[in-house]
Swiss-Prot record:
It is found in: Cytoplasm. It comes from Bacillus thuringiensis subsp. konkukian (strain 97-27). Pfam families: Aminotran_5. HAMAP family: SerC_aminotrans_5. InterPro entries: Aminotrans_V_dom, Aminotrans_V_PyrdxlP_BS, Pser_aminoTfrase, PyrdxlP-dep_Trfase, PyrdxlP-dep_Trfase_major, PyrdxlP-dep_Trfase_small. The modification N6-(pyridoxal phosphate)lysine is found at residue 196. This is Phosphoserine aminotransferase. One of its GO terms (biological process) is L-serine biosynthetic process. Pyridoxal 5'-phosphate binds at residues 76-77, 102, 152, 172, 195, 237-238. The lineage of its organism: Bacteria, Bacillati, Bacillota, Bacilli, Bacillales.
């Protein structure tokens, strides 16, 4: 069977050259006579893999020396707890900006650790936009401020990163890390689950300023303390070694594409193909405020559930799969991460045009 175009929000499409290299090295990695999946994480071979992955990420994101790159487990969802356990250490209070389902879940976990202030929210607009933060961060005594740079479910993203004076800015970048350029120095902590733009599920990346490490309460569990990973080069216990290995190959592929600046231009072009059609369509609509449209996750719908279901079924027959929208939003959603080729997006648009002609 030929490969399909997979528009899944995560786990998501991986670059075909990456999969082919993994396939080639799967049984016998680098002449060792064993697979990465069988290899000791204490071996020199794996040490070089995790070191190279960290170096590549630093290079691609231009990460300053005062930041640590940590390879973690538990998904971004575990970070919802780790962050307050490690950073709510002075005022026992944090600020959260609500822009979607995931930021709301992050807030709910933080409330179990300390006091949470909702700085701004677009919930009244059904999370179809990004709220303004002007003047809301005056002299607040907060341990950190948390944002979600791209909202996977709702299809919105920050156009400008808010300036937070004297308070660490924490960002969930799970669905748009490495898809566009960010100034890492604006953040105290960046975290992301790997399974959208970095690699396979099982790995979480944290990029954290060194002066934010070491402040966890003494009752903080060892495995939830950033210091544990910092002191042990992310090798305190067995890491998700295969996921780290595949992520390294994805980062190599990304570098070959010209790095983040080149991939950002590709992503703008790909998303424009779909948005331009949606703006002209008489059948399909996008619920998102055009100012804050995501480059990665694009929700859209037709006037009826029946048409939505028909669209999804016929799309699947054409090899355009996993287009069903999240249950909280409905309709359809095309996730067009870094690895999605422009041809895949064009195939989707061509099909949407045909479907509209059939259902005028």
């Amino acid at each position: 069977m030929e490969r399909v175009y997979n528009f899944s929000a995560g786990p998501s499409i991986l670059p075909l050259p990456v999969l082919e290299k993994v396939q080639k090295e799967l049984v016998n990695y680098n002449g060792t006579g064993m697979s990465i999946m069988e290899m000791s994480h204490r071996s020199s071979y794996f040490q070089s893999i995790i070191d190279e992955a960290g170096s590549l990420l630093r290079e691609l994101m231009n990460i300053p020396d005062e930041y640590e790159v940590l390879f973690l487990q538990g998904g971004a969802s575990l970070q919802f707890s780790m962050i307050p356990l490690n950073l709510m250490n002075t005022y026992k209070k944090a600020g959260y900006v609500l822009t979607g389902s995931w930021s709301k879940k992050a807030l709910q976990e933080a409330e179990k650790v300390g006091e949470v202030q909702v700085i701004a929210s677009s919930e009244n607009e059904k999370f179809t936009t990004i709220p303004k933060l002007d003047g809301l961060l005056g002299n607040e005594k907060l341990d950190y401020v948390h944002i979600t740079t791209n909202n996977t479910i709702e299809g919105t993203k920050y156009v400008d990163i808010p300036h937070v004076d004297k308070v660490p800015l924490v960002a969930d970048m799970s669905s748009n890390i490495l898809s566009e350029r960010y100034d890492v120095s604006k953040f105290g902590l960046i975290y992301a689950g790997a399974q959208k733009n970095l690699g396979p599920a099982g790995l979480t990346i944290a990029i954290i300023k060194r002066d934010l490490i070491g402040g966890a309460d003494r009752y903080c569990p060892t495995m939830l303390n950033y210091e544990t990973y910092s002191k042990n080069n992310s090798l305190y216990n067995t890491p998700p070694s295969f996921s780290i290995y595949v992520t390294k190959i994805v980062l190599e592929w990304l570098k070959e594409q010209g790095g983040v600046s080149a991939i950002e231009e590709q992503n703008k072009m790909k998303s424009s193909l779909l948005y331009n059609f949606l703006d002209e369509s008489k059948l399909f609509t996008s619920p998102v405020d055009p100012t804050y449209r995501s480059l990665m996750n694009i929700p859209f719908t037709t006037p009826s559930e029946e048409l939505n279901n028909e669209f999804l079924q016929k799309a699947k027959e054409r090899g355009l799969v996993t287009l069903k929208g999240h249950r909280s939003v409905g309709g359809m959603r095309a996730s067009i991460y870094n690895a999605m080729p422009a041809h895949g997006v064009q195939q989707l648009v061509n099909y949407m045009k045909e479907f509209e002609l059939e259902n005028r």
